[in-house]
């Protein structure tokens, strides 16, 4: 690693979010182009940087900075250059020259120790002298903080966050309890805090360490979809993580309960936010579940509603069976209503009838779904605009601070949605935190209609909201089961219902939309997959190769999405001199690639452009599972532009590309809420807990026109027979029963 020293002549580009900087450094009269993460660095500053020279294919020789530290200039030229660079607000080149001429080599000492003397310089008042001194002190403090934190291997980007969080208190936090960082600073988790603690000599059985480890263990469980852990599991997992005994952990669990960071209900231990999320949801649901004013359940009124619905259906040429009509009636009579059912059972027709009824009443109707793809499908199916739930609630990054993990919304109890009816589709995808935010924005008296298929995989985030709502039996609900004539002609729909009931399906390839190609050799599967995507399926379903989606149960392995994406990229979007690309870890992103966002980021800005590239809409937030194409890679600004399927464009800094993955192949779990013209499922076998009925059902119901299974019929049959599922620890059902005074269940449910 080489070291260079010089001053920043000027900044070519600096990303305000992550600090990625392109700058010109002057070294003894020589200009050197430098690139790296240098957040907070400004023009005129003197630095010593470590890194290496690289040869950029377009911009030539550059110095790639790995670490740097700012150094205070000691000569008059350096002092004048720094003060006049714009680093100090209100001081230009002329004023900087007068200051240095007045105080000479003593300039910086005067500013730090006798700032009032700056008023001796023409053009500087006593107030301005103090402002200059304060700015110099702040920059000095930040420089010293960065140097201090670098010794613990903390990047400059994280170091700036830590300093901004604590200020001068940072040093005492680092010495006494670095585990506070894991709770207070976005980007610093338990692992980083634990490494710092080890370096400064904090013992492995420290109370601070054990408390932080317990919270981290529960956070990991939340990442697996749980809202709590049984005490014994928490003790076991915590002991394994921390390398201590369960006896060391138990007292700290009690202390965290006293501190209200944990909540214990019987043997269930919750991180406090998730206990209160479920409890708050239960209370708000109870408040919404009221008979509507126009309904007193009089027989004559029920008959009038039925006749009106029948007339409307006839006028709209809509065919509804008895259960669908009952569903519409329940949505009219109740403040809260749940509509469930599998594919082809008429949920969309029922939703359309509900919308038309309330539209005829002059009511304001809002439609939403968890993802952009699901919202787009809802719009196409109903003819009414549907938004993502995040857009409906008006995500606001200013309320979230610097933490990209947290969502805060403009719409809440103080500023509720101005709607008479809110309809949410794909409820199986909604986690407990998003559901809580939604309910906070809905006033009692507003109708809330929740729609979904409970047999789909549960949400990626914590909870199993739809299943718990239905299991509680506390709210009006209709489950549609009949497969309608048009849907009944689709073997995708018929087979989905058979699979869901545990019935074996025909795999004889006599279908027009459901095929199995029996293959046992992985390389042969690769070959056929490429042929299907490049040629056969696009012609068969009238789509492009990029519309065909490979869905796999696994991330790893020869048929996992990581391996498949590398193979499919080579054939579907090969390297080309006309296409820019950028390496990130083991992946290469190329213009034209199909990509997916793999975590929620509530800070990312997006815009939608119309004709002539004129922005017509903008907002915040890109979410786990959003898919799109790479439109541009810009090496100058170190950004990559993705256009998502719903038209949003997002500029990603190169440093933020760990949030993106190639998506020619994705896991079935990530496909929730999406629909594709054709789906390919490579199924040769794998872990029993993964290769189950629920996963197969979800995978095939993602296809609109064609399902092709590449692999083993035996694997398919085993999956249909396999009802083992990953259990989720949730208690929303229990909380609902408590607040609604329903009979208690004997134990908390553990459902998939």
Name every feature range the model reports, one short phrase each.
Residues 1-297, 752:
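Accessory, non-ATPase domains that flank or precede helicase/AAA+ motor cores in DNA-metabolism machines
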Residues 11, 49, 597, 630-633, ...:
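A generic structural signal for residues embedded in beta-strands
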Residues 264-342:
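Pre-Walker A segment
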Residues 325-329, 333-510:
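ASCE P-loop NTPase helicase motor core
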Residues 454-620, 739, 747:
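Conserved helicase motor core of P-loop NTPases
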Residues 617, 624-752:
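C-terminal accessory regions
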């Amino acid at each position: 690693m080489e070291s260079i020293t010089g001053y920043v002549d000027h900044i070519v580009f600096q990303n305000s979010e992550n600090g990625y900087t392109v700058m010109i450094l002057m070294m003894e009269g020589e200009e050197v182009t430098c690139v790296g993460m240098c957040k907070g660095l400004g023009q005129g500053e003197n630095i010593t940087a470590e890194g290496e020279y690289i040869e950029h294919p377009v911009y030539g020789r550059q110095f790639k900075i790995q670490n740097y530290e700012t150094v205070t200039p000691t000569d008059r030229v350096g002092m004048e250059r720094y003060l006049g660079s714009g680093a100090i607000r209100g001081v230009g080149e002329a004023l900087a020259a007068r200051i240095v001429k007045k105080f000479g080599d003593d300039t910086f000492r005067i500013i730090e120790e006798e700032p009032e003397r700056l008023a001796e310089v023409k053009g500087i008042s006593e107030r301005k002298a103090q402002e200059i001194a304060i700015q110099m002190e702040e920059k000095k403090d930040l420089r010293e903080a960065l140097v201090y934190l670098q010794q613990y291997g903390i990047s400059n980007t994280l170091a700036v966050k830590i300093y901004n969080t604590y200020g001068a208190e940072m040093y005492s936090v680092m010495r006494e309890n670095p585990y506070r960082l894991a709770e207070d600073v976005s980007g610093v988790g338990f692992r980083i805090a634990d490494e710092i603690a080890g370096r400064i000599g904090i013992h492995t059985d420290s109370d601070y360490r054990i408390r932080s480890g317990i919270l981290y263990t529960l956070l990991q469980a939340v990442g697996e979809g749980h809202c709590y852990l049984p005490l014994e599991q928490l003790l076991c997992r915590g002991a394994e993580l921390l390398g201590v005994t369960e006896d060391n952990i138990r007292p700290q669990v009690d202390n965290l309960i006293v501190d209200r960071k944990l909540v214990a209900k019987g043997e269930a231990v919750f991180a406090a936010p998730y206990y209160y999320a479920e409890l708050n949801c239960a209370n708000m649901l109870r408040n919404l579940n009221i008979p509507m004013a126009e309904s007193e359940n009089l027989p004559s009124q029920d008959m009038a509603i039925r006749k009106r619905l029948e007339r409307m259906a006839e006028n709209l040429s809509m065919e509804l069976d008895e259960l669908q009509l009952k569903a519409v009636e329940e949505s009219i009579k109740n403040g809260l209503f749940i509509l469930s059912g599998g594919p082809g059972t008429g949920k969309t027709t029922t939703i359309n009838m509900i919308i038309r009824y309330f539209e005829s009443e002059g009511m304001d109707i809002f439609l939403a779904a968890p993802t952009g793809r699901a919202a787009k499908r809802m719009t196409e199916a109903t003819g009414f605009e549907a938004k993502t739930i995040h857009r409906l609630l008006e995500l606001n990054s200013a309320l979230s601070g610097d933490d990209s993990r947290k969502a805060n919304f403009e719409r809440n109890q103080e500023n509720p949605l101005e709607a008479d009816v809110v309809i949410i589709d794909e409820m199986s995808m909604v986690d407990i935190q998003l559901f809580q935010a939604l309910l906070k924005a809905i006033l009692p008296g507003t109708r809330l209609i929740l729609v979904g298929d409970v047999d789909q995989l549960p949400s990626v985030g914590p909870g199993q909201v739809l299943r718990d709502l239905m299991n509680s039996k506390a709210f009006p609900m209709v489950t549609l089961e009949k497969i309608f004539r048009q849907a009944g002609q689709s073997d995708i729909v018929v087979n989905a219902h058979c699979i869901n009931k545990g019935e074996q399906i025909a795999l004889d390839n006599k279908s027009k939309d459901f095929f199995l190609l029996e293959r046992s050799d992985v390389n042969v599967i690769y070959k056929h997959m490429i042929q299907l995507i490049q040629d056969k399926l696009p012609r068969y379903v009238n789509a492009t190769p990029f519309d065909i989606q490979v869905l796999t149960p696994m991330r790893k392995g020869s048929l996992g999405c990581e391996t498949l994406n590398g193979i499919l990229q080579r054939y579907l979007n090969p390297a080309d001199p006309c296409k820019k690309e950028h390496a990130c870890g083991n992946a290469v992103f190329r213009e034209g690639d199909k990509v997916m966002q793999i975590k929620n980021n509530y800070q990312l800005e997006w815009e939608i452009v119309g004709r002539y590239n004129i922005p017509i809409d903008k907002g915040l937030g890109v979410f786990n599972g959003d898919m799109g194409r790479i439109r541009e890679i810009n090496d100058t600004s170190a950004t990559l532009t993705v256009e998502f399927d719903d038209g949003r464009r997002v500029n990603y800094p190169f440093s933020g590309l760990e949030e993106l993955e190639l998506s020619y192949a994705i896991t079935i779990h990530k496909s929730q809420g999406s629909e594709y013209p054709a789906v390919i499922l490579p199924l040769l076998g794998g872990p029993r807990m993964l290769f189950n009925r629920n996963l197969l059902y979800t995978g095939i119901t993602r296809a609109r026109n064609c399902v092709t299974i590449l692999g083993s019929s035996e694997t398919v049959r085993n999956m249909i027979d396999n009802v083992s599922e990953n259990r989720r620890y949730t208690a929303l059902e229990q909380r609902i029963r408590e607040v609604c005074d329903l009979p208690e269940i004997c134990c908390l449910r553990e459902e998939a």
